[in-house]
Amino acid sequence: MGSEMCIRDRLNSFLKSAVSASFNRITVDGDTSTNDAVTLSATGQSGIEITAGSQHAEHYEQALTTLMIELAQDIVRDGEGASKFVEIRVTGGESEAACDQVARTVAHSPLVKTALFASDPNWGRILAAIGRAGLEDLDTDAVSIHLNGVLIAEQGARAASYTEEKGKEAMASEDLLIEIALNRGDAGAVIWTTDLSYDYVRINAEYRT
């Protein structure tokens, strides 16, 4: 990415902040590439100087982060064989790192990803992934899970209000939001990922080096 602003010392901090909120929030299958990179340059040709603490700096950082989030989500939507775009939002954690750990464990679970491909609101697989995320003293009875606004699990089991009709309706969209409330703190984290389809297996099985 490039800019004509005169930024100087703040350019690297802007980039790190925006990448943390965007490209570092995505995963398709848990693997990372050896040659992925994000670059940001500023030529200064506009003559507009971005100084620390200024309104220009705040607006620039917000715009840069918004742009990078859009680009990062486009990468997920274009994932190999992806048929669903999935946002996993974890709240109520003791720290952002703990919430991130839960979100990534769910996002990387083959059982969760294949259930999403099958449009199966399988709360058991999601809860199992949460349970193996490695959080100490996690009370699964305190965890609740919503899928596209539908409560599917609470108190360690299927929600009493849940019906198959509600689950089917929630899974109808190509964009899915999984909300996981840990109810043990005030921190949160979000990860964007995909389902795991037949085409993902085919594409990667047919690709030979």
Roles of regions detected by a PLM:
Residues 1-7:
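Short, small-residue-biased leader/transition segments that mark boundaries at the very start
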Residues 4, 32, 46, 120, ...:
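Gly/Ser/Thr-rich beta-alpha loop segments that engage phosphate groups in nucleotides
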Residues 11-71:
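Acidic, glycine-rich loop-and-beta core segments that form the ion-binding/anion-interacting portion
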Residues 12-16, 39, 84-89, 141-147:
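Beta-strand segments within the central parallel beta-sheet cores of soluble alpha/beta enzyme folds
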Residues 19-28, 70-76, 128-131, 161-166, ...:
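Glycine-rich, charged/polar anion/phosphate-binding loops
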Residues 23-35, 70-87, 113-120, 137-142, ...:
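Flexible, glycine/charged-enriched surface loops at secondary-structure junctions
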Residues 44-118:
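A glycine- and small/hydrophobic-rich beta-loop-beta segment
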Residues 100-101, 108, 112-209:
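Internal helix-turn-beta structural module
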